[in-house]
Regions:
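Glycine-rich N-terminal loop/short-helix segment of MobA-like nucleotidyltransferase
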Residues: 97-110
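Amphipathic, non-transmembrane alpha-helical scaffold segments
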Residues: 2-3, 118, 141, 183, ...
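Acidic, low-complexity terminal tails and accessory targeting/binding regions
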Residues: 31-92, 101, 126-127, 131, ...
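Short catalytic helix/loop segments, enriched in acidic residues and glycine
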Residues: 109-125
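Short glycine/proline- and acidic residue-enriched helix-loop micro-motifs
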Residues: 63, 189-210
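Generic beta-sheet signal
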Residues: 8-9, 13-24, 89, 228-239
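Phosphate-coordination/substrate-recognition cap region in phosphate-metabolizing enzymes
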Residues: 4, 122-190
Length: 251
């Protein structure tokens, strides 16, 4: 079945393929597409009428997969699925900054939220209004901390613990630059960053492995701090959150 899907995809550009199936079948399909066909089955939860989106990009005679979303249920009446397990962690990326809007690599430059970023945090807080968080963690940079503060504005007494190990990847000499500027000076390195980011060390910056080591250590400490029925907010960055999710899925 997967081979037939990929054949259809690889022969046509801009395909949108709708697959409606069962819990176990869809979990196996997702795991196969991300290259983990025998692992992670119990790590994926799929609610009734939820949807997941996977972006496939042609790469020679093969493909690469990007997870857009898993188990999306915001279109249903119950915004947040019921809790399974002893505690729950909500992992959130910070809202928009002016550099995000302009398409600049910001990394560890401490840019605050812009108006749209604050609005995004407000909407996230409204979406999570029925969640009574009792623990909160944030990267020690302005944009995630501001995001956490806005989300928790109805629970201002809850202390947000800032964690240095959750700060964004260091883009080195790329920080503050537009992609077009980087392409002029480091065209080959930028191409590799888009195709195989795990193999790239940015000039005077960090690698994905560097971020993985510090972010996973910090996240595991957060997990070990959990007590029964804890509801924990954690706000960090794009690269940090991706490494955490990849570690959880075993990819």
């Amino acid at each position: 079945f997967i081979k037939e899907i990929l054949k259809t995809f690889l022969e046509k550009e801009n395909s949108n393929i709708l697959i409606i199936g069962h819990n176990a079948i869809l979990r196996c399909l997702i795991l196969s597409l991300i290259g983990r066909p025998k692992k992670g089955f119990r790590k994926i939860r799929l609610e009734n009428a939820s949807f997941s989106i996977l972006n496939l990009s042609k790469q020679n005679d093969s493909y690469k997969t990007q997870i857009e979303c898993l188990n999306q249920t915001s279109h249903l009446n119950n915004c947040i699925p019921s809790k399974i397990g002893d505690s729950r962690i909500f992992l959130i990326r910070h809202g928009e900054t002016n550099w995000n809007k302009e398409g600049r690599f910001q990394g560890q430059i401490d840019i605050p939220l812009n108006k749209n970023g604050k609005d995004q945090a407000e909407k996230t807080g409204e979406y999570l209004k029925d969640i009574n968080f009792n623990k909160a963690f944030s990267s020690s940079m302005k944009r995630p901390y501001e995001t956490a503060q806005i989300i928790l504005q109805k629970n201002k007494d809850l202390k947000i613990r800032m964690i240095d190990s959750l700060i964004e990847i260091n883009h080195g000499l790329w920080e503050g630059k537009l992609e077009s500027e980087i392409r002029e000076e480091w065209p080959y390195l930028l191409k590799n960053w888009h195709e195989k980011p795990e193999e790239v060390i940015m000039p005077e910056g960090e690698s994905i492995s560097n971020v993985y080591e510090r972010s996973i250590k910090a996240f595991r400490e957060i997990c070990l701090s959990q007590e029964y029925n804890d509801l924990t907010l954690t706000v960090a960055h794009d690269a940090v959150n991706k490494t955490i999710i990849c570690d959880l899925l075993g990819i």
